[in-house]
């Protein structure tokens, strides 16, 4: 939508540069492990996919970027993750974790409010490759933004930074 000019800005996860797109803001957006408070791994500073494999998992479907990142890392390690739930709906996997069904994955921005409330624990996944994704605010290269849109971009830059 940004490249075609139908949108002034785009907010997306990215793993590569895009032609004709300027990045107004970028921050790392690693895949995080989601755990219920009180889980045996919840007090760790980080977890590995091998540790996560010991528990029931809710994972996104194979066609998603997050799942592809997980599958690449698992392939390198010869690790097989068996999901008991496959869903691309954040609310579904968060409920699964909160109700003690097991562990899942998400970006920090998707669960920031739940972590702040203490409703869920999010930890970095320390396996190499799980941090190779950015959250970007994108604009069309060479396009001047209207004042109101630029003000919104500035607000995003202020509000987006998180813990990771």
Where are the language model's segments positioned?
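Short beta-strand->loop
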Residues: 22-32, 85, 108-111, 117-131
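Short beta-strand-to-loop elements that line the ligand-binding cleft
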Residues: 13-14, 60, 80-89
């Amino acid at each position: 939508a940004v490249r075609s000019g139908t949108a002034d800005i785009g907010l997306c996860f990215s793993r590569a540069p895009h032609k004709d797109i300027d990045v107004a803001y970028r921050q790392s957006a690693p895949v995080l492990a989601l755990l219920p408070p009180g889980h045996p791994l919840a007090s760790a500073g980080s977890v590995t996919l091998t540790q996560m494999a010991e528990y029931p998992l809710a994972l996104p479907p194979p066609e998603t970027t997050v799942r592809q990142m997980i599958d690449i890392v698992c392939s390198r390690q010869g690790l097989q993750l068996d999901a008991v739930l496959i869903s691309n709906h954040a609310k579904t996997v968060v409920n699964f974790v909160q109700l003690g069904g097991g562990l899942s994955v998400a970006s920090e921005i998707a669960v920031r409010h739940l972590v702040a409330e203490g409703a869920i624990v999010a930890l970095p996944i320390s396996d190499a490759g799980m941090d190779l994704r950015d959250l970007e605010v994108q604009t069309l290269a060479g396009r001047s933004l209207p004042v109101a849109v630029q003000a919104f971009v500035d607000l995003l830059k202020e509000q987006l930074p998180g813990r990771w």
